[in-house]
Regions:
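Double-stranded RNA-binding/processing signature
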Residues: 1-182
Length: 182
């Protein structure tokens, strides 16, 4: 498998992998390797671990708020845009292993690719050193966003805000038309 110098990335993460192959797998986009040696399985695991860590954090830090509010707060932290911003901060695009064709199409700069790879790295950290260490790393990486989190603020996605606004004005709920992205 292709090797990259990942020491700069590990420094940005504040974490040194015991099994460096886990990090390489987490960085390997499916365009580079269609076999099982790509980051999709680690992304699946990382997504679950990230949601669990943030859920636990919110549960402990905001003990008096209800489940719906915690769900909205978690969604404001764990989403493609948020993870994309975190990935840009650590220059993750410089480390993603992709096919040359995908790189020419600027695939290493796409939100989905960066946020998915970020989740894969969380999954790799979990497999490398377990939940406790992963929790410390995630909380450190999200520290700035967590500090700015305010339980009094309403955390709603734009669709929910639109529906509630229309409902308050006694309008019928909107009808949504979805299109397929290419």
């Amino acid at each position: 498998m292709f090797e990259k110098d990942t020491s700069k990335l590990e420094k940005e993460l504040g974490f040194r992998f015991e099994d460096s192959l886990l990090l390489i797998e987490a960085l390997t986009h499916k365009s580079f390797s269609s076999s099982e040696e790509n980051n999709q399985r680690l992304e699946f695991l990382g997504d679950s671990i990230l949601n669990t860590i943030i859920s636990e954090y919110l549960f402990n830090e905001f003990g008096k708020i209800n489940e719906g509010k915690m769900t909205s707060m978690r969604a404001s932290l764990v989403n493609e845009n948020s993870l994309y911003e975190l990935a840009k901060k650590i220059k993750l695009n410089e480390f993603i292993i992709m096919s040359e064709e995908e790189i020419l199409r600027k695939g290493n700069l796409r939100k989905a690719a960066l946020s998915d790879t970020y989740e894969a790295i969380i999954g790799a950290i979990f497999l490398d050193q377990g939940y406790k260490k992963t929790k410390i790393i995630v909380i450190n990486l999200l520290n700035e966003k967590l500090k700015n989190l305010n339980s009094e603020k309403t955390f709603k996605d734009p669709k929910s805000e639109l529906q509630e606004s229309l409902q308050s004005m006694k309008f019928k709920p909107p009808k949504y038309i979805t299109s397929i992205k290419s």
